[in-house]
């Protein structure tokens, strides 16, 4: 976005990642285009502007496992949009990650307490040991109501890896015309409700009323 001339405010909970971002911006000659802020998505008090054209939540809503925290983070972002501003938010899909689990950790299925908690609640059991990848996987049916309750008008919801979650590495190796034709097809079908939940990630786009 900065390369396209937009002024950007980038927020992350990790000071270390903000430092990495700062170094890359300097290397690219874009440090004057981007303001960097270390903050929790649930408290954007340091971001005082209320007239952003767009806000991108590319992680907080699937790392916050408590529903109230997700709602708080979403409200913080929406409150900083101008009227008509766009919000983009990413989710892990409840069932889209199963292909990865089957391929990389087939023994997961034997921990039935974990399996049932994931299927019904989208997260690990409450008594699961701390550490590792901590995430919430949303059911597709909850995404639109969550956003519209915050005063957003839904523009579209799409699966990010529609129909290819089990083998997107093959797509990533494609080049030229084949890659473009596959991209066009996947974009066309990405909002089909029958396959959206099979994507690893789901993208919501909404407009502030």
What are these regions (language model features)?
Residues 110-135:
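C-terminal alpha-helical "lid/dimerization" subdomain adjacent to the S-adenosyl-L-methionine
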Residues 132-157:
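Short alpha-helix
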Residues 86-118:
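Conserved class I S-adenosyl-L-methionine
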Residues 71-86:
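A short glycine-rich, Lys/Arg-flanked "PGG" loop and its adjoining helix->strand segment in the class I
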Residues 42, 46-55:
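A short acidic, Gly/Pro-enriched loop at the edge of an enzyme's catalytic core
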Residues 1-44:
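Class I SAM-dependent methyltransferase SAM/SAH-binding core
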Residues 155-209:
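A C-terminal cap/extension of S-adenosyl-L-methionine-dependent methyltransferases
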Residues 53-68:
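A short SAM/SAH-binding and catalytic strip from SAM-dependent methyltransferases
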């Amino acid at each position: 976005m900065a390369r396209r001339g937009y002024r950007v405010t980038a927020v992350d909970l990790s000071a270390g990642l903000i430092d990495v971002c700062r170094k890359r911006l300097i290397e690219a000659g874009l440090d004057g285009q981007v303001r960097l802020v270390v903050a929790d998505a649930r408290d954007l008090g340091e971001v005082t502007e209320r007239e952003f054209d767009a806000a991108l939540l590319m992680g907080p809503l699937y790392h916050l496992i408590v529903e109230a925290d997700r709602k708080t983070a979403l409200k913080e972002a929406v409150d900083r949009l101008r009227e008509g501003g766009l919000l983009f938010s990413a989710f892990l899909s409840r069932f889209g990650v199963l292909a990865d689990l089957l391929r990389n950790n087939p023994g997961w299925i034997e921990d039935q307490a974990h399996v049932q908690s994931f299927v019904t609640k989208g997260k690990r059991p409450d008594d699961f040991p701390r550490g590792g990848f901590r995430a919430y996987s949303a059911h597709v049916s909850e995404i639109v109501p969550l956003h519209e309750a915050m005063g957003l008008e839904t523009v579209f919801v799409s699966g990010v890896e529609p129909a290819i979650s089990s083998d997107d590495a093959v797509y990533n190796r494609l080049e030229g015309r084949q890659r473009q034709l596959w991209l066009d097809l996947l974009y066309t079908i990405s909002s089909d409700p029958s396959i959206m939940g099979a994507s690893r990630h789901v993208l919501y786009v909404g407009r502030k009323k």
